[in-house]
Curated annotation (Swiss-Prot):
Gene3D superfamilies to which the protein is assigned, alphabetical: P-loop containing nucleotide triphosphate hydrolases, Probable tRNA modification gtpase trme, domain 1, tRNA modification GTPase MnmE domain 2
EC number: 3.6.-.-
The protein's name in its UniProt record: tRNA modification GTPase MnmE
Domain TrmE-type G: 223-383
Binding-site residues, GTP: 233-238, 252-258, 277-280
Organism, scientific name: Synechococcus elongatus (strain ATCC 33912 / PCC 7942 / FACHB-805)
């Protein structure tokens, strides 16, 4: 896909919900975008065709003259467009038929169906965006919380790319100084080793400052997966319902009511959280319940955090111990539910387990009590605290973290080379590695295969 030949591409740019969408957009980009649009769009009246001016009219099949839709057209001529090419958007009525037929007319008129992410790839290749900005567009589209959206917007505005380019320029300056001494050793004064050591230390510290945001950024981007586990009838489903503030799971006094995983999507302290209410774990002869129990075990093993829930009035039982042993390799937070059934004195007297937990939280889910304490304990357990009040300029992805780590490691080797007073040729190897790694974040140095992989993760039409 990389290295496009200048052809014109087309794709549906909006999500299509059959019979429900109000507006659907078909987007064209390329040298022939306006010519193709003129073939299929009939302007109503005497409206002038001008860039960035919306036109009203009709989409028609140019061969048969058949009316396809009443629509709006928005031309955005190069370079003042998303891709820095001529871009035309056709705003149709939503639903499948109008946009699909409009897209087919565009292709018949000479456009090619765009590949996933190809519009953004063209924006990158044409210098409209750097690679970190391009990746942030996918993050913005998939953001599950206001904080994740804020981080994506910060990166889109260049708040990640700018410091990365500054770091790369500093490394390039050091490399230029070193190579000048290699090529013109007799004509230049010796390197100021103390100054270079200070520059390397400062650059490494700046890289570490960016890397220190990686864990929180990953939580913003991908979220947490939390499994609520426990024996039957301890209030797991009530806990999910109270937490979700709606009836997501059926609640009865009968053990084994929940037989399958029940999922809820929540935001906790700015972090997207997928909560799974699992079937009560116990020995059972019921084949359907056995399947649910096995799914509960698998859900717990794949969770980032397990909420082991017990009944306050029953205390810690042998069954609870067995369940703990099954999930003990995961981070566990103990939830003591139904606290309202005990007096204050009884709560203090209850025998708590000796195992180490991330935290112990008392709740009364049926009365919606203890949920705030639970959320605070979760944020403490993952080590983030509440992220809603923080200003997020970016959220590093795994590729960016790996590149920064590579650059940081390479600079440390340069420092070691300096301290060991090795020949200057040794410096250049590691400096070039750091420069290449930093350049891969913003796209100055990136393999075509990596570009294809990055943009293949985008949706078609973006």
């Amino acid at each position: 896909m990389v290295g496009f030949s200048g052809d014109t591409i087309a794709a549906i740019a909006t999500a299509i919900v059959p019979q429900q969408g109000s507006v659907g957009i078909v987007r064209l980009s390329g040298a022939a975008a306006t010519e193709i649009a003129r073939q299929i769009f009939q302007i109503a009246g005497q409206q002038p065709w001008e860039s960035h001016r919306i036109l009203y009219g009709y989409i028609r099949d140019p061969e048969s003259g058949r009316l396809v839709d009443e629509a709006l057209l928005l031309p955005m001529l190069a370079p003042r467009s998303y891709t820095r090419e001529d871009v035309v958007e056709l705003h149709c009525h939503g639903g499948l038929m109008p946009v699909q037929q409009t897209l087919q007319l565009c292709i018949r008129a000479g456009a090619r169906l765009a590949e996933p992410g190809e519009f953004t790839l063209r924006a990158f290749l044409n210098g409209r965006l750097d690679l970190s900005q391009a990746e942030s567009i996918a993050d913005l589209i998939s953001a599950q919380s206001p904080q994740a959206a804020q981080a994506a917007l910060g990166s889109l505005q260049g708040k990640l790319g700018h410091p990365i380019r500054q770091l790369r320029d500093r490394c390039l300056d050091i490399l230029a100084e070193v190579e000048a001494r290699i090529d013109f050793e007799d004509d230049l004064p010796p390197l100021d080793l103390e100054a270079i050591a200070a520059q390397l230390t400062a650059a490494g510290a700046d890289m570490q400052a960016i890397l220190s945001t990686a864990d929180r950024g990953e939580l913003l981007r991908t979220g947490l997966k939390i499994a609520i586990v426990g024996r039957p009838n301890v209030g797991k489903s009530s806990l999910l319902n109270a937490w979700s503030r709606c009836d997501r799971a059926i609640v009865t006094d009968l053990p084994g009511t929940t037989r399958d995983l029940v999922e809820s999507q929540l935001i906790v302290g700015g972090i997207p959280v997928q909560v799974l209410d699992t079937a009560g774990i116990r020995e059972t002869s019921d084949q359907v319940e056995q399947i649910g129990v096995e799914r509960s075990r698998r859900a717990a093993q794949s969770a980032d955090l397990v909420l082991l829930t017990i009944d306050a009035s029953a205390g810690w039982s042998a069954e609870d111990q067995t369940i703990w042993e099954a999930v003990s390799d995961r981070p566990i937070l103990l939830v003591i539910n139904k606290r309202d059934r005990l007096s204050e004195a009884e709560r203090h007297a209850i025998a708590l387990p000796q195992q180490e937990f991330k935290a112990i939280v008392w709740t009364a889910a049926a009365q919606q009590q203890g949920i705030e304490d639970l959320e605070a304990a979760i944020l403490a357990a993952v080590g983030t605290g509440d992220l809603t009040s923080a200003n997020w300029d970016w959220a590093l992805n795994q590729r960016q973290v790996a590149a920064l780590t590579t650059a940081q490691t390479a600079l440390r080797r340069v420092e070691e080379t300096l301290q060991a007073q090795l020949p200057l040729d040794f410096w250049t190897i590691d400096l070039r590695e750091a420069i290449a790694a930093l350049g891969s974040i913003t796209g100055e140095e990136i393999a075509e295969s990596m570009l294809d992989l990055i943009f293949s993760r985008f949706c078609i039409g973006k």
